[in-house]
From Swiss-Prot:
The gene is cmoB. Keywords: Transferase, tRNA processing. Its EC number is 2.5.1.-. Gene3D superfamilies: Vaccinia Virus protein VP39. This is tRNA U34 carboxymethyltransferase. The lineage of its organism: Bacteria, Pseudomonadati, Pseudomonadota, Gammaproteobacteria, Vibrionales. It holds the Pfam family Methyltransf_9. Belongs to the class I-like SAM-binding methyltransferase superfamily. CmoB family. Catalyzes carboxymethyl transfer from carboxy-S-adenosyl-L-methionine (Cx-SAM) to 5-hydroxyuridine (ho5U) to form 5-carboxymethoxyuridine (cmo5U) at position 34 in tRNAs. It is an enzyme of class 2 (transferase). PANTHER family: METHYLTRANSFERASE, TRNA U34 CARBOXYMETHYLTRANSFERASE. One of its GO terms (molecular function) is methyltransferase activity. It comes from Photobacterium profundum (strain SS9). Homotetramer.
Length: 324
């Protein structure tokens, strides 16, 4: 189905990543043998994507590719039809040969909030946990990262990532693996680890924070972004049912409480660098994601609350160092 051989070759050359070869090939082999629903249809579409390298690639300011002389109108329409087969597009935006993929999330806005507060990524190996379709991985490469590895169990995200990677000319500095972080050994290998939009989906948030720490080298940096509430170091919300129509959510600490959690798990120099209310300009339905989105999840009578009556989504970004 997929060949991960290039990734195996790459990590075999890294002393700290090489031990991953003891478990990873079997895990990915098991994944390939499992049933995957729409995967066959998506793979047939994926095989039709061009792989020739575009003349102009911009992953510093956005994620876009184009040829100097443009693309024929018929070829552009064919490419757009292929991309639309991979609906819904949640993370982006992308501009592929003049085709603007207007995704549900303005993930570039999140990146603009994160970037000023982190250590330079130049030459770093980066792990992006819950990476979605890999949008931020391209932006990390745009900042000079040597290698970005994303993990996300969603098959559609994997296919979308591979489609974009093909349109990038098969860039082999970014890899997405269909795994969850609980499937990773304690690698202690990455210079920077990102976890954005994952923590509130975890039944045991402290275990997740420790799992992030176990992937970092000594003095490596973690960037943790998650939904939070207002309050002091003891404030935490545990929704009794759904939150903004999400059913698989568990813990919403205050940013101050999350800082305490990270320190409890052994991180140092923990900083709260941003807190932002998610707006309906940042998350909304589009032509490329036609399902319900944030506007439908907020109370029609009070947009400061979800339709269940909880505080509307607010996100915090924390940055910390692994001293071990």
């Amino acid at each position: 189905m997929f060949s991960f051989s290039e990734f195996y070759k790459l990590i075999a050359q890294h002393e700290t990543l090489r031990p991953w070869l003891n478990t990873l090939p079997k895990q990915l082999s098991d994944w390939e043998e499992a049933e995957h629903g729409d995967m066959g249809r998506w793979i047939r579409a994926l095989k039709k994507f061009p792989t020739d390298k575009p003349d102009i690639i911009d992953i510093k300011n956005e994620v876009s590719v184009r040829y100097e002389d443009g693309i024929a109108n018929g070829e552009q329409k064919r490419l757009e039809s292929l991309l639309r087969l991979l609906h819904p597009w949640r993370k982006g935006p992308y501009n592929m040969h003049g085709i603007h993929i207007d995704t549900e999330w303005r993930s570039d806005w999140k990146w603009d909030r994160v970037l000023p507060h982190i250590s330079p990524l130049q030459g770093r190996s980066v792990l992006d946990v819950g990476c979605g379709n890999g949008y931020h991985m391209w932006r990390m490469l745009g900042e000079g990262a040597a290698l970005t590895v994303g993990i996300d169990p969603s098959n559609l995200f994997l296919i979308q990532f591979e489609a974009i990677r093909r349109l990038m000319g098969d860039d082999n500095r970014a890899f997405l693996l269909p795994l969850g972080i609980e499937q990773l050994p304690e690698l202690k290998a990455f210079d920077t680890v990102f976890s954005m939009g994952v923590l509130y989906h975890r039944r045991s948030p402290l275990d997740h924070i420790i799992q992030l720490k176990n992937q970092l080298r000594k003095d490596g940096e973690v960037i943790l972004e998650t939904l939070v509430i207002e309050g002091d170091e003891n404030a935490v919300l545990v929704p009794t049912g759904r939150y903004a129509q999400m059913h698989n959510v568990y813990f919403f600490p205050s940013a101050k409480a999350l800082k305490v959690w990270m320190e409890k798990c052994g991180f140092v120099d923990v900083r709260i660098v941003d807190e932002s209310v998610t707006t309906t300009d940042e998350q909304r339905s589009t032509d490329w994601m036609t399902n319900n989105s944030l506007p439908e999840y907020l109370s029609p009578d009070d947009p400061t609350k979800t339709i269940e009556g909880y505080p509307a989504p607010k996100r915090a970004i924390l940055v910390a160092r692994n001293p071990d």
